[in-house]
Design a protein with these regions (language model features):
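Generic structural detector for well-ordered beta-strands
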Residues: 30, 116, 182-184, 220
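Glycine-rich strand-loop-strand elements at beta-sheet edges
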Residues: 109-111, 140-144, 148-187
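Surface-exposed or flexible loop/turn and strand-edge residues in extracellular/cell-surface modules
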Residues: 1-3, 11, 26, 39, ...
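Non-cytosolic beta-sheet module surface loops
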Residues: 20, 31-34, 119, 129-133, ...
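Extracellular beta-strand-rich recognition modules
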Residues: 121-131, 175-180, 191-199
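Terminal (often C-terminal
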Residues: 55-139, 144, 148, 162, ...
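Extracellular repetitive beta-rich solenoid segments
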Residues: 1-58, 198-202, 224-227
């Protein structure tokens, strides 16, 4: 068994030696032309070519939270897309970034109801919808819906639905539900999402109309990894 022995001026040495078992063929490793950066490691391309690469970052690279900033009125059975101000009465309900909450990495962007991702990757979305019924009004269903497009809005597909209901009683009745979805975003210019609400007899979507920095109806985005 042969080895390369590098002797220090103090007398001790460091050696590179062959594998314990005989390789199936001759193996050649080609070193990179320059030194890497601090913390990088050598990686092979499977053909013996070595290069310096950075280790993947541990933990989540991106977490972002968006909050509906006003209440929104739903008609009976109608689906409304939250953030599209043309569908609402009693004020403009828009998505605003919850900058008072902790976030990680790059932010989502939104135009009316459509969210665009900051980079490609696998994303998890947790959409919480809070609604209230007027006195003595029942709702057999209240749905939170997540829609995706992979062709920049030419087609939209409902990918997640979460349902609840509300009893009829005197006074205001609050309900909330949560829909979740994981989306493989391979192209940020075409892969986008939007969030909707629907109720049987109509209801009001609760938003942060008083700007008290409370999350009522909101979405949490997490980038889980590369596509």
């Amino acid at each position: 068994m042969s080895n390369i022995k590098l002797v220090h001026s103090g007398g001790n040495s460091v050696s590179l030696t062959t594998p314990t078992n005989n390789p199936s063929s001759n193996v050649t490793f080609k070193l990179p032309q320059a030194d890497g950066s601090a913390g990088q490691v050598l990686q092979t391309d499977g053909s013996g070519n070595l290069s310096w690469v950075s280790l993947p970052t541990a933990g989540l690279e991106m977490v972002d939270i968006w909050d509906l900033n006003h209440v929104a009125t739903m008609g009976s059975g109608s689906i409304i897309y939250l953030g599209n101000s043309s569908t609402y009465s009693g004020g403009t309900a828009a998505w605003t970034r919850a900058t008072w909450s902790a976030t990680i990495g790059s932010a989502m962007t939104v135009s009316n109801e459509v969210f665009t991702f900051p980079s490609t990757g696998i994303y998890e979305m947790q959409y919480t919808l809070q609604t209230w019924n007027q006195s003595n009004t029942e709702n057999a269903y209240i749905y939170a819906r997540i829609y995706e497009t992979t062709n920049n809005g030419s087609n939209w597909y409902n990918r997640a639905v979460s349902g609840t209901n509300a009893i009829g009683r005197s006074g205001t009745v609050y309900s909330h539900n949560r829909a979740a979805y994981i989306f493989d975003v391979t192209d940020t210019s075409t892969h986008k999402v939007k969030f909707a609400a629907q109720a049987e007899t109509g209801a009001t979507v609760n938003g942060d109309a008083s700007a008290d920095n409370n999350l009522y109806t909101y979405v949490i985005f997490k980038r889980l990894g590369d596509t």
